[in-house]
Design a protein with these regions (language model features):
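C-terminal motif of bacterial Sec signal peptides marking the signal peptidase cleavage site
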Residues: 20-23
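Compact, glycine-rich, soluble single-domain proteins
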Residues: 25-175
Length: 175
């Protein structure tokens, strides 16, 4: 049985993910998906058109309930300031790659996020949340780029690589 410190840390991480917003995290399906503004991001000499997640509600919803992610598509999460970030895979029927990016556009961490079993009938939201793996940046980041699972590996993206996009303009728009 985990010690009290481990349980407390897990609870703190779950709270941090809920407060920060994360990938594929809407516990209830949206009534109707809305079209989001997009931005172009250059990743390993390839252009990606990424949906923008500029506010807490959009970051919280993330890529949930998407049956597929286009090969050069995905989402760009923008936060008002750099901080340690964490993601979970809720209601995501497809695997996702996540690149945590600093305020300069440099990759500081990469996570491969696998599909998690959906919330079971009779399973409480709290129990569902508690069983989801947490994918943490480990260091401060201001942006997260999410793409189809395996895509960042195909491109050979690595920690330290530079992404090309207008970090300053997006940073000013984050709420």
């Amino acid at each position: 049985m985990p010690g009290r410190a481990v349980v407390s840390l897990r609870i703190a991480l779950i709270a941090a993910v809920a407060a920060a917003g994360a990938a594929c995290v809407d516990p209830d399906p949206p009534a109707r998906p809305t079209a989001l503004e997009t931005a172009w991001v250059e990743i390993a000499d390839q252009l990606f058109e990424l949906e923008l997640a500029l506010d807490g509600a959009t970051r919280f919803r993330g890529l949930s309930d998407r049956p597929r992610i286009p090969g050069n598509g995905g989402m760009l999460f923008v936060y008002p300031r750099p901080r340690p970030l964490a993601l979970v895979m809720r209601r995501c029927p497809v695997p996702i790659d996540a690149a945590f990016v600093d305020e300069e556009g440099r990759v500081v961490a990469i996570r491969v996020m696998e599909v998690e079993p959906p919330r079971a009938p009779g399973e409480s939201v709290a129990a569902y949340e508690a069983r989801l793996p947490i994918y943490a940046s480990g260091v401060p980041a201001q942006f997260v780029v999410e793409t189809a699972g395996g895509r960042l590996g195909e491109l050979g993206l690595a920690v330290g690589d530079q992404l090309v996009f207008d970090t300053e303009a997006l940073r000013q728009r984050a709420r």
